[in-house]
Amino acid sequence: MTGRGKGGKGLGKGGAKRHRKILRDNIQGITKPAIRRLARRGGVKRISAMIYEETRGVLKSFLESVIRDAVTYTEHAKRKTVTSLDVVYALKRQGRTLYGFGG
């Protein structure tokens, strides 16, 4: 026993380093038609052209807060994988209870 806990790597035992794509401006992946479909589902008939960027900004800030809370739950449990329950608890903490995923 080396006392490193579970999943620790010893010296010289590191895995191969992979090149990771730099993530930037991925919010543009939420396309105009996707936003339009969400609005249609919500009962919206006509959409102003300025709505799309505003929607992306609001969605980004919402997801940042939910993910921050979910990662906090994950780190507290000493895990490296965010589970669906972490997200459910993060949403519940923000007053947006989600049913159907346990918890």
Swiss-Prot record:
Pfam families the UniProt entry points to: CENP-T_C
Compositional bias of kind Gly residues: 1-14
The record's account of how the chain is modified after translation: Glutarylation at Lys-92 (H4K91glu) destabilizes nucleosomes by promoting dissociation of the H2A-H2B dimers from nucleosomes.
Carrying N6-methyllysine, the residues are: 6, 9, 13
PROSITE patterns, per database record: HISTONE_H4
Q: Which GO terms describe its cellular component?
A: nucleosome; nucleus
Q: Which residues carry this modification: N6-glutaryllysine?
A: 92
Keyword Transmembrane helix listed:
no
Chain positions covered by the region annotation Disordered: 1-20
Task: Quote the subcellular location field of this record.
Answer: Nucleus; Chromosome
Which residues carry the record's DNA-binding region feature?
17-21
GO MF annotation, one: DNA binding
Family classification: Belongs to the histone H4 family.
Q: What does this protein do?
A: Core component of nucleosome. Nucleosomes wrap and compact DNA into chromatin, limiting DNA accessibility to the cellular machineries which require DNA as a template. Histones thereby play a central role in transcription regulation, DNA repair, DNA replication and chromosomal stability. DNA accessibility is regulated via a complex set of post-translational modifications of histones, also called histone code, and nucleosome remodeling.
UniProt subunit comment: The nucleosome is a histone octamer containing two molecules each of H2A, H2B, H3 and H4 assembled in one H3-H4 heterotetramer and two H2A-H2B heterodimers. The octamer wraps approximately 147 bp of DNA.
Q: What is this protein called?
A: Histone H4.2
Q: Which organism is it from?
A: Talaromyces funiculosus (Fruitlet core rot fungus)
Encoding gene, per UniProt annotation:
H4.2
